[in-house]
Amino acid sequence: MRFNVIVQSAADFQTWVVDQQQPAPAPQTDLEKAGAQIVTQGICSACHTVDGTAAQGKIGPNLTHLYSRSIFAGGIAPLTDANLQAWVMDSAAMKPGSLMASVHVSQQDIDKIMAYLKTLK
């Protein structure tokens, strides 16, 4: 697994710690709300946690502040909308041996999931 080290002042680090302890923001748009339902009450919640929601899985990464990160997938990919969508659609294609289950969802549901995930900052 790769790691990136970010050097911050003590004050900036403390601000980051406080921010990371906050629950996920509430989705605002209908698309975000539909995505939240899929992520927090659907198959994603079996493995992933989103603090402040019903999603309390322990196997996969905590998604609460996903978009506060610059990389994901165990450090192999920059966190961009395109990379995350590709990961959600087929993680094994990006990272062979990925433990994320391959799920088949419609493009419409992918759009909903992505809209919600992008709110998790």
Where do the language-model regions lie?
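Extracellular/periplasmic metallocenter environments
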Residues: 1-15, 45-46, 51
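C-terminal capping alpha-helices of c-type cytochrome domains
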Residues: 9-20, 87, 91-121
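Electrostatic cytochrome c docking/interface patches
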Residues: 11-40
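Short microdomains enriched in Cys/His and/or Lys/Arg
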Residues: 11-18, 66-76
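Solvent-exposed, acidic/flexible segments
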Residues: 28, 32, 56, 77, ...
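Periplasmic/extracellular electron-transfer cofactor-ligation site
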Residues: 36-62, 69-74, 89-96, 119-121
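Flexible gly/pro/ser-rich segments immediately N-terminal to CXXCH heme-c attachment motifs
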Residues: 39-41, 76-79, 100-107
